[in-house]
Swiss-Prot record:
Disulfide topology: none
Assembly and interaction partners: Part of the 30S ribosomal subunit.
Gene Ontology biological-process entries: translation
Pfam families in the record: Ribosomal_S27
SUPFAM superfamilies: Zn-binding ribosomal proteins
Gene Ontology annotations for the cellular component aspect, listed alphabetically: ribonucleoprotein complex; ribosome
Organism (species): Hyperthermus butylicus (strain DSM 5456 / JCM 9403 / PLM1-5)
Sample GO molecular function, one term: zinc ion binding
Coiled coil: none
Official protein name in the record: Small ribosomal subunit protein eS31
Record-linked SMART domains: Ribosomal_S27
Cofactors, names only: Zn(2+)
Cofactor binding remark: Binds 1 zinc ion per subunit.
Amino acid sequence: MSKELKLYVHRLYEYDYNTGTIKRKNKICPRCGSFMAFHKWPVPRWHCGKCGHTEFVREAKR
């Protein structure tokens, strides 16, 4: 395996050494099942590059 591939996988998943479980860092798209990307600017949102689904983040009001 190349070094670039190993580094890329570490960006997608997180390993918990205490429990021995692997979990995904980003959300999963409800329409197609692929990873979603988080964008901060101009408005915070989750976007799927595969199908184009977008979820806007709402701030909690105090």
